[in-house]
Amino acid sequence: AMLFSTLIGTVVGTVSGYFGGWLDNLMMRAVDILMAIPAFFLLLVVNAYLKPGVDNIILIISLLTWMNMSRLVRAETLSVKEREYVLYARASGEHPLRIIVRHIIPGVLPTIIVAATLNIASAILMESTLSFLGLGVQAPAASWGSMLNNAQSYIGEASWLAMFPGILIL
C-alpha cells in the first residue's frame, strides 16, 4: 500500500512543484480538499462497499495516504528546482520530463525514502484496525488486528494471545 501511495504522491508532488503556477494551485487545492476529509471515516465507508480482502485494503490505504507524501515532495521539489544543476539543465533545453527524472527525483529521493518508511507504520495501524473490526483481511490470511479480535475471548486464560500482536502493532 505504501508503494502505491508513494508513487502517486511523488508524481503529484513533483509535477505540481516543478511546473508551478495555476497547475500547482489546482493540484494543491485538490490535495487540501482531500486532506480535509477524515481518512479513517472514509476508510470505513469505502471498505463497507467493497468486499473485504487484501487487494481492496491495499487499494483503499494507498488512495487515502498519498496526500501527505505529495505535499512533502512538492516542498522538496520547490527547493531542488532552484539549484544550479537544475537551472543549467533547463537553460540547456532539456525536456521537463528528463529534468524531473534525472535531476529532481534524485534530489528528492532521500526525503521520499524516509517519509515512506515512517508512513508504513500508519498503514499497518489502519490495516490492523480494519481487521480488528472485522472489515479487513479475512480468516485464511493472518493479520495482527484479526489476531487481537480472536484473542479477546481468551484474554483471561491466555493473555499472550493478545499481548504479542498488540505489542507488534504498537
Where are these regions (language model features)?
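Alpha-helical transmembrane segments of integral membrane proteins
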Residues: 1-170
